[in-house]
Design a protein with these regions (language model features):
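Acidic (Asp/Glu) and glycine-rich low-complexity loops/linkers
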Residues: 31, 104-221, 225-260, 264-280, ...
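Short, structured interface segments that constitute the first stable element of a domain
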Residues: 2-6, 12-15, 338-368
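A short amphipathic beta-strand at an alpha->beta junction
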Residues: 79, 420-421
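Short leucine-rich amphipathic alpha-helical surface patches
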Residues: 62, 391-396, 410-414
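Charge-rich (acidic/polar
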Residues: 1-108
Length: 438
């Protein structure tokens, strides 16, 4: 504790007797409570009353000792002391004298809902949720409140680890066989220091106000859900996997987003810097991306639906993945491979495209484009019949296809098995049987 508070030798000398008296007062305030699980209904009610009395007694001791600690500590050190120990009611099991409860053979929600106050949240920096917890970050909350079935709530835990609020179930015993029908709701106050959210199996976190911070690290998996808007943040790292879901808008300086294994991300992304986004393994992303630089990779059955707007962008679609949406990029590099497909209205100065292995790239719209370079192979297809391109440089081979419109100069190098259809007033440098005007 002394190390946590960073006390000087002089402070330690004055702090020790006060802290010793404080701990003794806590011990006197807490009364033992019988295990309500093995008792009848009346005994369970009595145990609940005793538990609440313990919480009130602990709160009173902490309140009484604020002024005593103030003789030695600053207000911030007192706050840190109570945070480090676990604030009033944070760990109900400790206040009740139940520190090592294990889940029984079968734990099934009774349907009888009860609510407990677990005390103040403090200046927490992270939230971590175990299975079945649904956490709401509320601007109107003042303390942590937990609502669950009356036969479940005594098996819930809150640990504080370096500023992290970690919600979980008590450890399973060797005889635990089934956990079912659990509904656990937690409401926590807002913390300006929040930087991380980690959501586990069938759990969720929802923020009822936009989250702000220098950097954010958010992850969810195994059907975990997060609903939150991020604004004015720095570097943001977001991972969605294993049927997890993230819903909300993101405004940040830079982003690293990953959606995989049937994960779902719904919401727009706006970056002042670089946005690195990957969607794979049948994951899906539905939302516009706006950034100075966009690096988007969609693969392995992944899906992206939304507009891309950037000064420069690199888009890659492969392995049966799909991408669709408007592309407003001054300098675009795009590759489509392995039966991937990309379709969208393009507006920009330059485009460099590579399409192969049954990939399909369709650039729609009638915007004026300065230069487009296309490399086609292995039955790849490129289609931009209405795009007003000034200069084209196309190389096509291995049964690939292209359909284009050109206004100035059209350079084509095509193998005998490739086919190119063109239109427009542009001058064609090469003419052969497989290069034809529409």
């Amino acid at each position: 504790m002394i190390r946590e508070l960073d006390l000087s030798a002089k402070q330690v000398k004055a702090f020790d007797p006060i802290y010793k008296a404080y701990r003794e007062a806590l011990d006197r305030a807490i009364r033992s409570v019988p295990d309500p699980v093995i008792s009848g209904e009346a005994a369970q009610r009595a145990a609940l009353k005793e538990r609440l009395a313990n919480i009130a007694a602990v709160a009173q001791v902490k309140r009484d000792y604020v002024d005593r600690f103030a003789e030695v500590l600053t207000a911030e050190q007192i706050r840190l002391l109570y945070n480090t120990e676990g604030q009033i009611g944070t760990n109900i099991k400790r206040a009740a004298g139940e520190s090592s409860r294990q889940i029984p053979r079968v734990l099934s929600g009774s349907g009888r809902r009860v609510t407990q106050d677990w005390g103040e949240a403090g200046d927490y920096t992270a939230i971590e949720t175990g299975a079945f917890f649904k956490v709401v970050i509320s601007p109107s909350a003042r303390t942590i409140t937990v609502t669950a079935d009356d036969n479940v709530i005594d098996f819930l835990r809150l640990e504080r680890r370096g500023g992290c609020l970690a919600f979980s179930l008590s450890p399973r015993s060797s005889r635990t066989r089934r956990i079912e029908n659990l509904s656990i709701s937690v409401v926590v106050p807002v913390s300006a220091s929040l930087r991380e959210i980690h959501v586990g199996s069938y759990a969720g976190v929802e923020s009822r106000m936009p989250l702000r911070g220098a950097d954010f690290n958010i992850s969810m998996s195994a059907y975990g859900e997060v609903k939150a808007d991020l604004v004015d943040s720095g570097r943001t790292r977001l991972q969605v996997s294993s049927y997890g879901t993230y819903e909300g808008t993101i405004e940040c300086a830079g982003a690293q987003l990953s959606v995989a294994s049937y994960g779902v991300l719904k919401g727009a992304l706006t970056c002042t810097g670089t946005a690195d986004v990957s969607v794979g393994s049948y994951g899906s992303l539905n939302g516009d991306i706006r950034a100075a630089q966009v690096n988007l990779a969609v693969s392995s059955g992944g899906k992206y639906s939304g507009a891309v707007k950037a000064d420069a962008a690199s888009l890659g679609v492969s392995s049966y993945a799909q991408a669709a949406g408007a592309i407003e990029v001054a300098d675009l590099k795009v590759s489509v491979y392995s039966s991937g497909s990309l379709r969208g209205a393009f507006a920009g100065r330059r485009c460099e495209a590579t399409v192969g292995s049954y990939g399909k790239l369709a650039l729609t719209g009638s915007a004026v484009v300065e230069d487009v370079t296309v490399q086609l192979s292995s039955q790849g297809e490129f289609s931009a019949p209405d795009l007003r391109v000034k200069r084209y440089d196309i190389r096509a081979s291995s049964y690939s296809k292209a359909e284009v419109w050109c206004s100035e100069l059209l350079k084509i190098e095509a193998s005998s098995s490739a086919r190119v259809l063109y239109d427009g007033p542009g001058r064609l440098e090469t003419l052969s049987d497989n290069i034809r005007r529409r």
